[in-house]
């Protein structure tokens, strides 16, 4: 296996703190394919699952919706998002995501700089 290629089946799954019915896989992060400047995560949230309100103090986050629909709350305002929508969370901006009825919410998530650990938000 090439050191710059990550195979999904080789990545362990985890549920971040403050998230329910969520499964994430770190595709690119320090310690995987060698990136030190950003992190790429594939996430899935089942219907009714959510990322509780939180903010990332040291990192920016971009979330691209691959499948499903979600209610996204950003600084107290809520909007519905679906496939092909991109959500951007600047550092320190409080946000939450709730998966809506239908297929699981599948997300491609980018953090810059990377989170220090999958257990830290």
Regions found by a protein language model. Give the residues of each.
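Short acidic-glycine-tyrosine-enriched beta hairpin
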Residues: 76-91
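Short beta-strand His + acidic residue motifs that chelate non-heme Fe in jelly-roll/DSBH
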Residues: 53, 72-73, 89, 95-102
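Glycine- and acidic-residue-biased ligand/ion/polar-headgroup-sensing regions
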Residues: 58-60, 64-70
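A short hydrophobic beta-strand segment most commonly corresponding to one strand
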Residues: 42, 88, 103-118
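A short, N-terminal "cap"/entry segment at the start of jelly-roll beta-barrel domains
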Residues: 1-37, 119-120
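Conserved short histidine dyad/triad with adjacent acidic residue
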Residues: 26, 41-56
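Short histidine-centered beta-strand/loop micro-motifs
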Residues: 30, 51-57, 98-100, 119-120
């Amino acid at each position: 296996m090439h050191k710059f290629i990550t195979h999904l089946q080789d990545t362990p799954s985890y549920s971040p703190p403050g998230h329910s019915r969520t499964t994430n896989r770190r595709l690119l992060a320090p310690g995987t394919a060698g990136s030190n400047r950003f992190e790429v995560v594939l996430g899935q949230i089942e219907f009714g699952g959510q990322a509780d309100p939180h903010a990332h103090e040291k990192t920016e986050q971009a979330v691209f919706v691959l499948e499903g629909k979600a209610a996204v709350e950003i600084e107290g305002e809520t909007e519905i998002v679906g496939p092909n929508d991109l959500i951007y969370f600047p550092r320190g901006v409080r946000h939450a995501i709730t998966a809506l009825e239908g297929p699981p919410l599948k997300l491609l998530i980018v953090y810059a700089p990377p989170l220090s650990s999958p257990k830290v938000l």
